[in-house]
């Protein structure tokens, strides 16, 4: 040691160019701050014929951006963590499954487990960095883990070097369809993403515990994107060319947020594309794959129910997409008032024995509510259902009263004595139901009511 110190003093007095020699030592990870003279062979450090460089007593710089292969060979575990890359497994492999395979070969000192994730959707790329606590564990992983089967795939284990990282990254891009990493490729084109950024131990990366699996929080099939608002839908929505098929979600721009697995795991039974009715909302959220397994998100005003209507007349009605929240509340308030008033008037008329006017009032209220722009909403259906229940009750009461025959004959005589009122009522209904299809539906319902009435009268007389 003393001879090494004398050499340092002599070279320092002669103003030896230590900067150029120190630049060559940047590529070598030193064991400690001070090296002995025996650890300085000139043929290992420099290819030049100059005398061996002196040993600096100041701390050596960290090899941040030098070749990891040389660092891994020289340093051992002193300035670099003991880590390997484990890859070639399926994207749905969990951290627990990987740890179990590692423990099966006798390695129990796993310190950290980092999955390489797709920047766009958080899906696993099929390889991970495994950090262990000892170099012996690294040797075991490199010797015993390759060839182990994990979810039907033989895992590949390599030292944690930048070159191996690039190889695993290239394999991941081949395993994922082009749609899955189209956003990644665009990011790398403008210099914002490189393979090393996806999986490099750095302070900028937020380390997650092994139990956190971001790509498992994304639905791999028709589940909606729970955490995201629905995508903006420009009105009017484009309708599908085939009848009975829901229109595709217009203007969807979140396809890159949805995990498009190249193949589905055996424990997730997912039907083929197109076999799932409108859902997401898979969502929305995060996420339906871009291969059309997810239908349009449910609309507040049942906008998607129009193509499913069995009556062709419903398609010509007003589009609910133009109804704002305030307008919807106003229409619902008016419908509630109509329903309440019609029920009160019908009950009052039925109590007075005027069943004909009560039935006419309820039928008119039902027709008006059905014609409103929010008729397909569940709350409107509740109003219509209550009106129909009241109508059936009044009809049943009128039939029971008419069993004696007097009430029925009185009702017929009343209609014969006042044909003007019947014509006025019919004209009023035609004005309310100016739509031809709704007009037909209304009178079909009236005809069915009269047919039921005639059948009951006939059965009563027999």
UniProtKB/Swiss-Prot annotation:
SMART domains under this entry?
RRM (SM00360)
Chain residue ranges for the region called Disordered: 34-68, 161-213, 400-462
**Gene Ontology CC entries for this record:** cytoplasm; mRNA cleavage and polyadenylation specificity factor complex; mRNA cleavage factor complex; nucleus
A GO BP entry: protein heterotetramerization
Q: Where is this cross-link: Glycyl lysine isopeptide (Lys-Gly) (interchain with G-Cter in SUMO2)?
A: 345
Q: Where is the composition biased (Basic and acidic residues)?
A: 181-190, 416-425, 432-462
Quaternary structure per UniProt? Component of the cleavage factor Im (CFIm) complex which is a heterotetramer composed of two subunits of NUDT21/CPSF5 and two subunits of CPSF6 or CPSF7 or a heterodimer of CPSF6 and CPSF7. The cleavage factor Im (CFIm) complex associates with the CPSF and CSTF complexes to promote the assembly of the core mRNA 3'-processing machinery. Interacts with NUDT21/CPSF5.
What is the purpose of this protein? Component of the cleavage factor Im (CFIm) complex that functions as an activator of the pre-mRNA 3'-end cleavage and polyadenylation processing required for the maturation of pre-mRNA into functional mRNAs. CFIm contributes to the recruitment of multiprotein complexes on specific sequences on the pre-mRNA 3'-end, so called cleavage and polyadenylation signals (pA signals). Most pre-mRNAs contain multiple pA signals, resulting in alternative cleavage and polyadenylation (APA) producing mRNAs with variable 3'-end formation.
What's this protein's name?
A: Cleavage and polyadenylation specificity factor subunit 7
Organism listed in the record: Rattus norvegicus
Q: Which gene encodes it?
A: Cpsf7
